[in-house]
Amino acid sequence: MKISANSIRTGNILVCNNDLWVVSKTPEHTQPGKGGAYVQVEMKNLKTGIKRNDRFSSSDYLEKAELEQKDYQFLYFEGNDLILMDTKHFDQINVPKGILEEKLPFLTENMIVKVEFYNEKPLNIELPPTVILEISETDPVIKGATATASYKPAVLENGIKVKVPQYLAIGEKIVVKTDDITYVERAK
């Protein structure tokens, strides 16, 4: 399926020179004073792991890989693999940890994820858009800090660092976006 260069998003898998490339960073849309607008895209080769930056004209069309998507439940880690179970047929598959890279700490036991297959081979795992995590380290609460929009660093139970509002304390649960690792709100 062809998509416009302006439609490229993080996580898209593109076919370039007969290889599969995953968009690993949010594409930058640029319109210089001279010349046409372009999109700067950082991609990673799924076979070799090599990263590269490409610049596409806004009018270019690229081939997006046709992927089959299925729901799987994360069960456990086994060596360098994730063990996932199909939620419909209860079949188990092994998927290399490397597919998730920096998102691996967000994976929790029994989490439902979407696994994308290309020619029946698992290529990508999509996590839920948000997860609820507990704050394990942060500075003490400052009285009267609810009116300000300032943030302080916090370490979550999975070791990820995120900026949180001043009024949050250790032990509180928060909602975090998995795509850009940012604080959303206090968990209800």
Curated annotation (Swiss-Prot):
Key word Protein biosynthesis present: yes
GO molecular function annotation: translation elongation factor activity
UniProtKB keywords: Cytoplasm, Elongation factor, Protein biosynthesis
A GO cellular component annotation in the UniProt record: cytoplasm
Entries under Pfam families matching the protein: EFP (PF01132), EFP_N (PF08207), Elong-fact-P_C (PF09285)
Pathway as given in its UniProt record: Protein biosynthesis; polypeptide chain elongation
GO-annotated biological processes: peptide biosynthetic process
Compartments, record wording: Cytoplasm
Annotated function: Involved in peptide bond synthesis. Stimulates efficient translation and peptide-bond synthesis on native or reconstituted 70S ribosomes in vitro. Probably functions indirectly by altering the affinity of the ribosome for aminoacyl-tRNA, thus increasing their reactivity as acceptors for peptidyl transferase.
Family note: Belongs to the elongation factor P family.
HAMAP family: EF_P
Protein name per UniProt: Elongation factor P
Lineage: Bacteria, Pseudomonadati, Pseudomonadota, Alphaproteobacteria, Rickettsiales
